[in-house]
Amino acid sequence: MSLAEFDADVVVDARDCIMGRVASNVAERALAGDRVAVVNAEQAVITGTEDDVFSTYRTRANLGSDRGPYYPKRPDGIFKRAIRGMLPYKQDDGREALDSVRVYVGNPMDEDGDVLDGTSLDRLSTIRFVTLSEVSEELGANVTW
């Protein structure tokens, strides 16, 4: 299904938002039946020190064999995997919910996305965070964004 065929009910802007909080809201909306598009995934943030975050994702990327588990390196894949972890994706309703979510690097949609309540970086009391683009570069993804 191409971008032109995906008609989103809700467009969410992940710029300067905490990835886990956005992902949980998106998963909840997808389970409710909404078609959700997440834009600017590369600018979402993960809280924690740079060393801790990089260590976690490096361990995941190096884990697995030829038969899996497979962990994505690109920001859109990392974000979608976080959403998948919040859905019962092995059941029919969870699989349908995951299919109704699209994550994009940049903003290919005609409209600007909404910033969800409680997901903004402003709520942090610390300045320790890493963007998904930095994590992807550390994992060795081809930087095309």
Swiss-Prot record:
One Pfam family matching this protein: Ribosomal_L13
Keywords tagged on the record: Ribonucleoprotein, Ribosomal protein
GO cellular component: cytosolic large ribosomal subunit; ribosome
Single annotated GO MF: mRNA binding
BP GO terms, sorted: negative regulation of translation; translation
Subunit text: Part of the 50S ribosomal subunit.
Functional description taken from the UniProt entry: This protein is one of the early assembly proteins of the 50S ribosomal subunit, although it is not seen to bind rRNA by itself. It is important during the early stages of 50S assembly.
Family statement drawn from the similarity comment of this UniProt entry: Belongs to the universal ribosomal protein uL13 family.
Name the UniProt record assigns to this protein: Large ribosomal subunit protein uL13
Source organism of this protein record: Halobacterium salinarum (strain ATCC 700922 / JCM 11081 / NRC-1) (Halobacterium halobium)
Gene: rpl13
